[in-house]
């Protein structure tokens, strides 16, 4: 068994940091050491910001985004086209699409995808909220922007079935060759999807 080199407070910090996605035990140890060394400049302000986030952050009751206000900043932005809703699996997907800056639409966060094998059904996701938003009227288009996985496709089909008969155009993100991608490095499924989604130039 390895000898302890720090007190329980620093060990607890390391253990908690190791739970953050992208940080393993080794990276967490380095991050903790850096924070402790920069106690005044980093650790204090970080602890304060985390406490503030813990107290104020909530889930938007309209779209499922995380923010300090409800409805969130995205939902209350009057410059957005509220008649177009981009449906995403997770808040991280919403943020990624916003960074791309390609559309100025509203969003709806599902909170995952349907996965019967994992026991995740429609009632475990924010699908009912989406159906209610469309049923209220005023939604012209739904862009389903879920991952190109079996679960993502299942979720997209389920949503489409639930909205059958409603006056809304339902589209999906195109799948295929990434910008800067070389065909030789792509898998067969991606190439097949790219061929099916080909466009006129």
UniProtKB/Swiss-Prot annotation:
Residues 83-178 form the Toprim domain. SUPFAM superfamilies: Recombination protein RecR. InterPro entries: DNA_Rcmb_RecR, Rcmb_RecR, Rcmb_RecR_Znf, TOPRIM_dom, TOPRIM_RecR. One of its GO terms (biological process) is DNA recombination. It holds the Pfam family RecR_HhH. One of its GO terms (molecular function) is zinc ion binding. Belongs to the RecR family. NCBIfam families: recR. May play a role in DNA repair. It seems to be involved in an RecBC-independent recombinational process of DNA repair. It may act with RecF and RecO. This is Recombination protein RecR. It comes from Rhizobium meliloti (strain 1021). The gene is recR.
């Amino acid at each position: 068994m390895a000898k302890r080199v720090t007190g329980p407070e620093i060990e607890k910090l390391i253990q908690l940091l190791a739970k953050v996605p992208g940080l393993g035990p080794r990276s967490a140890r380095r991050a903790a050491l850096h924070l402790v060394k920069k106690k005044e400049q980093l650790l204090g302000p970080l602890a304060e910001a985390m406490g503030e986030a813990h107290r104020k952050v909530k889930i938007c009751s309209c779209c499922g985004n995380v923010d300090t206000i409800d409805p969130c900043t995205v939902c209350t932005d009057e410059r957005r086209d509220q008649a177009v809703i981009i449906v995403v699996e997770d808040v991280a997907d919403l943020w990624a699409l916003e960074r791309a800056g390609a559309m100025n639409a509203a969003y709806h966060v599902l909170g995952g995808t349907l996965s019967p094998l994992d026991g995740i059904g429609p009632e475990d996701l924010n699908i009912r909220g989406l159906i209610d938003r469309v049923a209220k009227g005023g939604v012209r288009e739904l862009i389903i922007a879920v991952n190109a996985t079996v679960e993502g496709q299942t979720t997209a089909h389920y949503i489409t079935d639930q909205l059958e008969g409603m006056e809304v155009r339902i589209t999906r993100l195109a799948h295929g060759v990434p910008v800067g991608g070389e065909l030789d490095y792509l898998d067969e499924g991606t190439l097949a999807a790219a061929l099916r989604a080909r466009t006129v130039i």
